[in-house]
A protein has these predicted regions:
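Residue-level recognition of single "structural anchor" positions
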Residues: 1-140
Length: 140
């Protein structure tokens, strides 16, 4: 089975909207699980951190992303396909972004709930991802 990843980034903020934080996500298309994430700015350096967070077995996978230039700089060309949302090749990670925004108030764009510290922003995201990934495991 050929592994495929969908990678995307979503905007969030800490304390006030001027303090932008970008959540970078790598989702395995076969299992729908999040295999890596990074919170940072929207630079190639943060994209590189995401790529380094991906487990070695998944780093051999083919990655589908949007056209954000950081992906072209970081992901090897033979493992990367940049595509538009209308292609459906990043539909699962886009759906996951919507699920995150739906279930965690601090990630909603217009909200009274927000993270007051980077630490809590990451802790809440880490807990959400952990629970999400566990929910995808087969029930015994």
């Amino acid at each position: 089975m050929k592994l495929e990843l969908e990678l995307d980034e979503l905007w969030s903020f800490v304390f006030k909207k001027d303090c932008k934080r970008w959540v970078w996500i790598a989702l395995c298309r076969q299992t729908r699980q999040i295999v890596a994430f990074v919170i940072g700015d929207r630079s190639a350096a943060t994209c590189r951190k995401l790529w380094q967070q991906i487990p070695p077995g998944y780093r051999q996978a083919h990655g589908y992303t949007d056209f954000w230039e950081a992906y072209q700089k970081v992901i090897p060309a033979d493992q990367h396909t940049a595509c538009g949302k209308d292609s459906g090749l990043t539909a699962h990670v886009e759906r996951w972004n919507n699920t995150l925004r739906q279930r965690l108030a601090r990630f909603v764009r217009k909200t009274l709930s927000f993270s007051k510290s980077d630490y809590m922003h990451e802790v809440c995201l880490r807990l959400f991802i952990h629970r999400y990934n566990l929910s995808l495991l087969p029930k015994k």
